[in-house]
Curated annotation (Swiss-Prot):
Its main location: cytoplasm. Catalyzes the rearrangement of 1-deoxy-D-xylulose 5-phosphate (DXP) to produce the thiazole phosphate moiety of thiamine. Sulfur is provided by the thiocarboxylate moiety of the carrier protein ThiS. In vitro, sulfur can be provided by H(2)S. It comes from the Bacteria. The lineage of its organism: Bacteria, Bacillati, Actinomycetota, Actinomycetes, Mycobacteriales. This is Thiazole synthase. Pathway: Cofactor biosynthesis; thiamine diphosphate biosynthesis. One of its GO terms (molecular function) is thiazole synthase activity.
Length: 259
């Protein structure tokens, strides 16, 4: 189970709606993923198909929407977007994403920290997108973030987990859920994130922009679960030298043979 604030989810996979080619493809992917929480960028408001908005789609699939402040460049913009989402959707949950520039799409940690502090004080449940800096993650937790979301790699790159050491360090120090966000390219990346100690994985492009979103969503669902189980099972320690899995005692020798 994944518990964020006072809400528990059975799935550790959070999906995003960005990059989906159609409502039909998105719906198939969401169902295949088993997700119960999905981000929606409020600035796009997702559009409609035959009168059905993405919010209608999520409601029909019984998936909770997670408003996202994607595209915001300042704490002020993020706070305003979160308040608009609260009014429009009746939710106090928000993924705070404040980017530094449109080329790297890397998070502006200073503005993110300010937005998190302001929104948490207003009673929002803040899931904060941040860098893979352990100090930044700790500052966001101290500011009231209900979950910290360090990137695996820049948004949309599909480069996977570029700094596994830092990600594992963030997980070991955090007392709130750590959800890796951005950079996931394929199922093995999602499994690794969970093996490093993450509580969950958020992804969008890896599924919505691949050749077969439904199949990849299925793969991601299994990968997240496999990584979580592997982490809880306790992997063997890494060794510099080989260690036989069977002893050499009782091996047959020429002395045992009848010539």
């Amino acid at each position: 189970m994944l518990t964020i604030a006072d809400t528990t989810f059975s799935s550790h996979l959070i999906m995003g709606t960005g990059g989906a080619t159609s409502h039909e493809a998105l719906e198939r992917a969401l169902v295949a993923s088993g997700t119960e929480l999905t981000t929606v960028a409020m600035r796009r408001h997702a559009g409609t198909r035959g009168g059905e908005s993405i919010f209608d789609l999520l409601r029909r699939l019984d998936i909770a929407p997670l408003p996202n402040t994607a595209g915001c460049r300042t704490a002020r913009e993020a706070v305003l977007t979160a308040r608009m989402a609260r009014e429009a959707l009746g939710t106090t949950w928000v993924k705070v994403e404040v980017i530094a520039d449109e080329h790297t799409l890397l998070p502006d940690v200073v503005e993110t920290l300010d937005a998190t502090e302001l929104l948490a004080a207003e009673g929002f449940t803040v899931l904060a997108y941040t860098s893979d800096d352990p100090v930044a993650a700790q500052r966001l937790e101290d500011a009231g973030a209900a979950a910290v979301m360090p990137l695996g790699a820049p948004i949309g790159t599909g480069l996977g987990i570029l700094n596994p050491h830092n990600l594992e360090l963030i997980c070991s120090r955090a007392s709130v859920p750590v959800l890796v966000d951005a950079g996931i390219g394929t199922a093995s990346d999602a499994a690794l994130a969970m093996e490093l100690g993450c509580s969950g994985v958020l992804l969008a492009s890896a599924v919505n922009r691949c050749q077969n979103p439904e199949a990849m969503a299925t793969a991601m669902r299994h990968a997240v679960e496999a990584g979580r189980l592997a982490r809880s099972a306790g992997r063997i320690p890494e060794r510099e030298h080989a260690q036989a899995s069977s002893t050499f005692e009782g091996l047959a020798s020429w002395a045992d043979q009848v010539l």
